[in-house]
Structure formats: C-alpha cells, structure tokens
C-alpha cells in the first residue's frame, strides 16, 4: 500500500529512523524512479537546528561515486525534507557475518571504496566523524557509498586547517585522541575509523568497546597480543596494515596516501569475487543492462489476523543509516518536482508501505524491478500462517527477555541491550506473500553486528517453524 506524498510520488517503505525523524523510500508511480527521503521533525531538533543546516550545506558540496548523492531539500512547516540517492544494496553491516566477517577480497574492495570516498571528503575539507558499517551503504552494483553527514564538519577551508575539539561519533570507532586531547586533527580520526571498519569486515566483530586503557581488549592490542580475537582471524598482510592504521599516536598513524601504497591494499583482487570490473575509484561497473526504476503500484495488504488493528503511536527521529543509491540522472524533471514539492501528506503507519514482492523470485527468473529493493539477509519464511508466526515469535522473544511492543498492524518493535550494555532496537514485519509469511527484521537503533547476532539467535530458537525455502536475494 503506497501513500501519496507529492504529485506522482508515493512513500512506499520505511528505511530507518532515529532521534529526530525517519527515512522513507519515495517512488514515482509514472517513471518508477526511487529516492530516499530523510524527514526531520524540526520541533524535535529544536535544540540543534544549526546541525541540520550544516548537514544540508555539506551535502550540497559533495558529488562522488562513493558518497550518497544529495538531490536537494525542502522545508514544509516544521518538517525538513532531504532528498537522497537510494541504495538498494542496504547497509554494509548486513554483509558481515557475526564473528566470521566476509571473504577477504570482498573486504578489500569495500575498503578501497571507503578510502576513495574519504579521500574525496578530505579533499573538500570535510571530515565525516562517524564512519561505521551502519553509515556505509551499498548500491545495486554493490558499490560502497558513505552516508549520513549529521556529525560531519568542515576542517579545512582555503588551504587552512583547523583543529577539532568536539568529541562525537560511536565509541568503538572513535580514535583514542578524542578521549584524551582537548584538540586533535580531523584526518587521522577518519583514518582510524576506517581501520575499525576493516577489522569488522575481516573478523566479524569489533576490536574493543572503546580505545582507552580501561578497556582490556585495547590494552591487549597495544601490547600486540595478536594471538587473541579478533586479530587471530585476520591474515598477516591486512593485519600489518591494521597495525599502521590503529596506531595510538595520531602523528605516527599511517596517512591515506601511504595506505594506498600498502602491499595488501594494492594486491590484485582474486578472480571470481565480483562481477564486472572496477573503475579507478574502486567502483564496480557491471556488464549488461540494469533496471533503472522501481514500480509502486503493487497491491499489498498487511497481515491483520495476528496483530489486530493499529493502536501504537509513532515517533519520528533522525534517520539511522540506511539511505542512498541512485539509478538515474538527477537532472530529471520528476525529481526536481519532488524536491520542489506541491502537497505533502504523511503516512499514518509507515510500515504498511512495505512492498509486496520485493524479495520474491526464483533463481534464473527475470527480475522484476521490485527485486532491486533493499537486499537484506535478516529475513526468513515460516511454515506457519500469520497467527502462528506471530505467536511463535512473541513466545521466543519473551523467553529471551526482549522488550516487545506492537507498533503497527503487521509490525512489532523489539528492544534489548547488546553485549556492551547499549540499547538495541529492531523492527519485525510479518508480510504475507503469495500465501507465505515472510518475517523481516530491520535494525532501528544500535550496532549492526549486534543486531545480526540477535537475529541469528531468534532464528535459531525458531528453527522448528522456519521454512527451508530460501529468501532469494538477487545478485549485485
């Protein structure tokens, strides 16, 4: 069920939410173009309106193949709309298997693309300050895109660099100087975060809670105890690079030009690890035609029998990572009209707009445009009907001590704490697809790797009712 937004445009899916708003997927019913719309409630952001303005200004400055494209913005009353590239490949963390990681050639390619994006940002005098897998998106060709510039700032202008003094970011990814020094340089901070992201990709876990002497894992790293996890899971060549990146002293830390000369970084990718070829910026250029549009007219009725009528209120919040990836020329008139806007209307229950056939298909069949919607591994079919699926999920979550709240007719919100005692919130949607029930999990707040760990635990507890039928994901 699509909800009209602006003339010819429908909001069809919630992509993410946070403290001040949410991100919705908008689809043009005539041209089938897709755009991510970041919707910010300026009343909720009343304490930091300048941050929103700065985010818009920074987005306007950027244009790079490894950075989510910004199409424009519009203010409508107390609501600010940011129109961004839509990335159908989802978040990077979804490709990381908890405690395992991903194949080394894959990690190398994503790391090269991350570095290419950071090089560009720094060349524009911009530092991101919150690089992590949740803020790194993948397009339909599995190209990495840096997203979410809510914490970004300008550190260099007209060749003059300023030191930073604000501690911000996500603790496992922040550089140690943020915790110790009143002022610090911007570029080494982003370099450090890239190293933590690479560790997560290669080992499937974060190296520490925070880079301080009070953290045993960090102390072990400084003492070069690489026989411990996660380092023992990483090959010697990338580990040697990580030693140079995750160097405590920022003046001794490797710079990006030297990273690009590193032996492992420059090693040719193994054959058979990707489709197409890689451009000079590390972007995969897949052969053959790619679908450029997404339909928005599929009829979809959410599961009602199990969860009853709508009865929960919604809070809009600043979008968590989860937007990006365009498939068309942004100069098209339809996108211009979307940005300019005519009549805006908000959905009563955003998750009712989940798409009916976004996952359905059989290997070898021709793909419909729906199958280019967000690819996620955190979903499965069940052997039960809607009522049975709902009850089984509820019983397992209650036994595991999770918080449980019905959010929408076909959605529940589950809350818990992760291994670091941080809040973890995810949404679960029960979708009826051709007489089958798909249980779809989406991270709402918290660490992506921890979210995947909890998903796997829940799926394991539901093994008796999980269908052996695979949720086929279209290849990149």
From Swiss-Prot:
It is an enzyme of class 2 (transferase). Its EC number is 2.7.11.1. It comes from the Eukaryota. PROSITE patterns: PROTEIN_KINASE_ATP, PROTEIN_KINASE_DOM, PROTEIN_KINASE_ST. Transmembrane segments: none annotated. Residues 9-265 form the Protein kinase domain. The modification Phosphoserine is found at residues 280, 296, 317, 345. The active site is at 130 (proton acceptor). It is found in: Nucleus; Chromosome; Cytoplasm; Cytoplasm, Cytoskeleton, Microtubule organizing center, Centrosome. SUPFAM superfamilies: Protein kinase-like (PK-like). Residues 391-476 are annotated as: Autoinhibitory region. Activated through phosphorylation by atr or atm in response to DNA damage or inhibition of DNA replication. GO terms for molecular function: ATP binding; histone H3T11 kinase activity; protein serine kinase activity; protein serine/threonine kinase activity. ATP binds at residues 15-23, 38. One of its GO terms (biological process) is DNA repair. Keywords: ATP-binding, Cell cycle, Chromosome, Cytoplasm, Cytoskeleton, DNA damage, DNA repair, Kinase, Nucleotide-binding, Nucleus, Phosphoprotein, Serine/threonine-protein kinase, Transferase. Residues 272-329 are annotated as: Disordered. It catalyses: L-seryl-[protein] + ATP = O-phospho-L-seryl-[protein] + ADP + H(+); L-threonyl-[protein] + ATP = O-phospho-L-threonyl-[protein] + ADP + H(+). InterPro entries: Chk1_catalytic_dom, Kinase-like_dom_sf, Prot_kinase_dom, Protein_kinase_ATP_BS, Ser/Thr_kinase_AS. Phosphorylated by ATR in a RAD17-dependent manner in response to ultraviolet irradiation and inhibition of DNA replication. Phosphorylated by ATM in response to ionizing irradiation. Phosphorylation at Ser-345 induces a change in the conformation of the protein and activates the kinase activity. Phosphorylation at Ser-345 also increases binding to 14-3-3 proteins and promotes nuclear retention. The autoinhibitory region (AIR) inhibits the activity of the kinase domain. Serine/threonine-protein kinase which is required for checkpoint-mediated cell cycle arrest and activation of DNA repair in response to the presence of DNA damage or unreplicated DNA. May also negatively regulate cell cycle progression during unperturbed cell cycles. This regulation is achieved by a number of mechanisms that together help to preserve the integrity of the genome. Recognizes the substrate consensus sequence [R-X-X-S/T]. Binds to and phosphorylates CDC25A, CDC25B and CDC25C. Belongs to the protein kinase superfamily. CAMK Ser/Thr protein kinase family. NIM1 subfamily. This is Serine/threonine-protein kinase Chk1. It comes from Gallus gallus.
